[in-house]
Amino acid sequence: MPMPTEERVSQLVAGLVERRGFDLEGVEITRAGSRADAQPRVTVVVDSDGAADLDAVAELSSEMSVVLDDTDIFGDSPYLLEVTTPGVDRPLTAPRHWRRAQGRKVRITLRPGAEPPDPGGSAGFEARVGVLDGEQIALVLGGKRNPHRVRVPLADIERAVVQVEFSPPGARELELAGGVAPGRPDPGTDRAIAADGAISEETSTAAASDPTEGIEE
């Protein structure tokens, strides 16, 4: 039978994801191998205001597998279900992404024609995410040496991606950002570095052909 669409899978799992306190960030369906008859791999990306732990993601994956099996959208074909939280390289595209990234360093590219927040600045720059206020985001520029806060309309930002940090920000820099989002680790700490390095591996995998398959870490 034909492979179901990503839109159809999204419709089937959206209610469950919301009930479990997550946001559905995306669904991707690929083949788990190079052969044309390789089993489908369904990757579901979820996130929440607090840091999602592996147990919660694993439980959601098990429930999601039941939902997909009950609808029989894959027929008798085995498939691989992978539920994961967003990696740090996933762009910030919605207001909630900015809210959850508060306190983190991001690489920003402005839209053509948008004025850089610092006079004489370029359209591409790094900043620390501050408090989201409606359609504007506070950004802390200048790093540890000269931290200062500016405001930029979200509409002026073409692309923004969180950066992995290996040392903590300056105290004043983080203060101007308003701290970090609740439930998220402080940037540059061992906990944050470990989370950034392992977040794409925090998956719960269930194959319809093998119900004993467990959790990959």
Swiss-Prot record:
It is found in: Cytoplasm. One of its GO terms (cellular component) is cytosol. Gene3D superfamilies: RimP-like superfamily, N-terminal. The keyword Amino-acid biosynthesis does not apply. The keyword rRNA processing does not apply. One of its GO terms (biological process) is translation. Keywords: Cytoplasm, Ribosome biogenesis. PANTHER family: RIBOSOME MATURATION FACTOR RIMP. Belongs to the RimP family. This is Ribosome maturation factor RimP.
